[in-house]
Amino acid sequence: MTQQDRPGAKTAENSPTPADQDVSPQTAPPGHEPSRGAGEQGRPDLPTPNTYPGEQQHLVEASPDQPQTKAEPKPPYPKEKLEEPGLEKEMSLKPQYMAPRYKATGKLEGKTALVTGGDSGIGRAVAVLYAREGADVAIVCTPAEQPDAEETRRAVEAEGRRFVMILGDLTDPKFCRDCVERCVRELGKLDILVSNAAYQNRKQSLEEITEEEWRRTFATNIDAYFYLTKAAMKHLQPGSAIIATSSEVGLVGSSSLLDYGATKGAIIAFTKSLAQQLADKGIRANCVAPGPVWTPLNPADRGMSPEKLAEFGQKQPMKRAAQPEEIAPAYVFLASDADSSYVTGIVLEEMGGLTTG
């Protein structure tokens, strides 16, 4: 397995915060009020933005399971198995997302981002760094992933930014449209769209892939990207950015991830074509292709054995899997019109030394 975003969106009845429910910042439930940005009065229970003991310009007090020094775990990893969709809070070796050495410079000050799959893994790390750089953040995940999303909420609000959680099923086109509208309604606008949520389930042969499985993978990984982008177009202004999570598998393939690899390749082609179409509008479209990343996606993959998980990332030149905090800065670069104003239509590879030509 290579690219690790998040498991796919699923339908759940009685979602506590459906996309079409208007929960304004003024009426949010106690303890869930959006926090204020730099220069505004924030929640009194949150740390002052851009302060962190021992780390200048790093603000949130790390969770107990987050390391305070730069030390990426290496194989062998714990042999464990998670039930779908896979919760980060249940992993014995927690993915690292805090990026304690990352120094923010206000690259995204005043911007608003919508991040799918922002409850954990790469999506959580991206949401946290976006907030650290000054952006307000809305994330999308399934109701089953809400326990992880609450940690993302805590981390984003501790950075002094506003946060919106949207729960539902990204395979539903209407829900995708509602996600965009709710982000704009509650945060005022949309500057950065990150299509990151994904579903994968390894199969050792083509014959094992059912039609239902094939459609679920495509609906979650590429169809949702199309629906979200189409809905976002009326809100995106010159200087806005669209970023999608592809994968090493989308570039080199995988014998056990035929459907997943096909969607990740489609993401690359769609993004490159989108970049050409939107260039004259001043809107940039790019994608990131991570290699193996330590997230809940793999222990929740029914086709990934605990023994294989223990060796995860060992075949990369760097001999290990990445941590989400190592991947997220690429998303900051691609979102910042100060850093990447002349960058569109690229695939930014983060694959631990593996090259594709």
Predicted regions and their residues:
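The beta1-alpha1 cofactor-binding region of Rossmann-like NAD(H)/NADP(H)-dependent oxidoreductases
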Residues: 146, 167-180, 211, 325
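Active-site helix of classical SDR
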Residues: 229, 263, 271
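C-terminal helical subdomain
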Residues: 26, 30-32, 43-50, 55-97, ...
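Conserved mid-core segment of classical short-chain dehydrogenase/reductases
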Residues: 76, 172, 177, 185, ...
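Catalytic Tyr-X3-Lys loop
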Residues: 199, 207-226, 243, 267, ...
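A glycine/serine/threonine-rich, flexible loop-to-helix segment
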Residues: 256-257, 280, 292-316, 357
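Alpha-helical segment proximal to the catalytic Tyr-Lys
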Residues: 234-235, 276-280
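Residue(s) in the substrate-gating loop at a strand-loop-helix junction
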Residues: 247
